[in-house]
Amino acid sequence: MLSLKLPRLFSIDQIPQVFHEQGILFGYRHPQSSATACILSLFQMTNETLNIWTHLLPFWFFAWRFVTALYMTDIKNDSYSWPMLVYMCTSCVYPLVSSCAHTFSSMSKNARHICYFLDYGAVNLFSLGSAIAYSAYTFPDALMCTTFHDYYVALAVLNTILSTGLSCYSRFLEIQKPRLCKVIRVLAFAYPYTWDSLPIFYRLFLFPGESAQNEATSYHQKHMIMTLLASFLYSAHLPERLAPGRFDYIGHSHQLFHVCVILATHMQMEAILLDKTLRKEWLLATSKPFSFSQIAGAILLCIIFSLSNIIYFSAALYRIPKPELHKKET
């Protein structure tokens, strides 16, 4: 019979510094794991196991919702629903890519960086999907058919390209300038989210307009709260920073961050679905639905330029002398 032995785990002082996580002392996988060992680690309690499953399981939930929406939509003729389908598709992509990144990030130093480059690209693709759905369904009455609305998605595309580049670049600073690395990475994700959310901020805190005063408002509020909590957890490394070694396997900040992000996405999806349904008559009377070329063009530009960023920075990994990128790893 075929027997598979679970890989050995390591402590923080047994692996190169590039694999270190703040406040996490034990449960590390071999820094040159095989693909098979990485897959087996899904069924072994390591410090990455729950990072993987907290996005892999939600991927199947969001995929089920996406397939259900596809089945119930007349895709060819219902252009009003296209932005929602694009958004739901991107909400499947980012948790899948994230779970794959966490699964295979221990294959080598460069593989770790490349895995997370792809992760950052997927997050930014989701950011663009959110912007497309917001533009189609959630904009407050006063901002519809304005210059801001006209250029909102175009600038969201630009934001995703810049954000992917900045977040990828930040990984080159991890060892030598960890604080600057963290600041750049947080800002790289914070400003696209802020741009995407401007119509929501206006709607919640200034003037929603008659058509936007509906049941979706509470979901938008919950989405914002969960996103702020996720941002705090990602930045603060709590609770493991206060008690190193106590939360290595269960309860560290990245696991909690994943849970908050998934809950935020769920709340966001419910809000957008409600806006799409409850505001349909008003929106169709006020503005034209996105054309296929507009949606496809935005998505393709995001994918092409984000992949270009990822390829450029991946190639740079092999051009930089090892002592420069990992010089403190001794």
From Swiss-Prot:
Designated gene of the protein: PAQR5
PANTHER family per record: ADIPOR/PROGESTIN RECEPTOR-RELATED (PTHR20855), MEMBRANE PROGESTIN RECEPTOR GAMMA (PTHR20855:SF38)
Miscellaneous notes: Non-classical progesterone receptors involved in extranuclear signaling are classified in 2 groups: the class II progestin and adipoQ receptor (PAQR) family (also called mPRs) (PAQR5, PAQR6, PAQR7, PAQR8 and PAQR9) and the b5-like heme/steroid-binding protein family (also called MAPRs) (PGRMC1, PGRMC2, NENF and CYB5D2).
Cellular compartments per GO CC: plasma membrane
Protein name: Membrane progestin receptor gamma
Keyword Cell membrane annotated: yes
Topology feature Extracellular, residues: 73-80, 135-141, 208-253, 316-330
Record topological domains on the Cytoplasmic side: 1-51, 102-113, 163-186, 275-294
Transmembrane stretches, start-end: 52-72, 81-101, 114-134, 142-162, 187-207, 254-274, 295-315
Membrane disposition: Multi-pass membrane protein
